[in-house]
Amino acid sequence: MAARLQEFYKEQVVPKLIEQFGYKSVMEVPRITKITLNMGLGEAINDKKIIENAVGDLTKIAGQKPVVTKAKKAIAGFKIRQGYPIGAMVTLRGERMFEFLDRFVTVALPRVRDFRGVSGRSFDGRGNYNIGVKEQIIFPEIEYDKIDALRGLNISITTTAKNDEEAKALLGAFKFPFRN
């Protein structure tokens, strides 16, 4: 069974974007290729348990096990040696990606404190969108009592859109709450 947003994309988003931008082929219509969740954990150099807890949180949020990212080179000012674990990331594609996007837009974003919509300026010029989340407790899978610290994460949405205008129209069609 395909994810709800996957069906929604095929049945409603594609025709809407074809009409809006005048694409000649269905394959021209921009689509979301992947969503990457990244958690930078600079404070993990002192305590290895921080990485384990962050990996656990990301696993619950994404539904798949993240990869622990390691330092590419040593930085004496930050007391980091090469190969030290300094973060965790997970890449979602296909059905899991659509399920995450559905939960993110319909459940997690409305739970953000003082939420007035996401910025419409966080596109990179090539049709990809980045959003920072200040605390992981906005996701319903995370239980507030069981976390050791509030951690933020970066969510990158990679699309096949050629420019920011197409990408914004694509995410807008997925009911993304843009404020501007």
Curated annotation (Swiss-Prot):
The keyword Kinase does not apply. GO terms for cellular component: ribonucleoprotein complex; ribosome. GO terms for molecular function: rRNA binding; structural constituent of ribosome; tRNA binding. Keywords: Ribonucleoprotein, Ribosomal protein, RNA-binding, rRNA-binding, tRNA-binding. One of its GO terms (biological process) is translation. InterPro entries: Ribosomal_uL5 (IPR002132), Ribosomal_uL5_bac-type (IPR020930), Ribosomal_uL5_C (IPR031309), Ribosomal_uL5_CS (IPR020929), Ribosomal_uL5_dom_sf (IPR022803), Ribosomal_uL5_N (IPR031310). Coiled coil: none annotated. The keyword Oxidoreductase does not apply. Part of the 50S ribosomal subunit; part of the 5S rRNA/L5/L18/L25 subcomplex. Contacts the 5S rRNA and the P site tRNA. Forms a bridge to the 30S subunit in the 70S ribosome. This is one of the proteins that bind and probably mediate the attachment of the 5S RNA into the large ribosomal subunit, where it forms part of the central protuberance. In the 70S ribosome it contacts protein S13 of the 30S subunit (bridge B1b), connecting the 2 subunits; this bridge is implicated in subunit movement. Contacts the P site tRNA; the 5S rRNA and some of its associated proteins might help stabilize positioning of ribosome-bound tRNAs. Belongs to the universal ribosomal protein uL5 family. This is Large ribosomal subunit protein uL5. It comes from Cupriavidus necator (strain ATCC 17699 / DSM 428 / KCTC 22496 / NCIMB 10442 / H16 / Stanier 337) (Ralstonia eutropha).
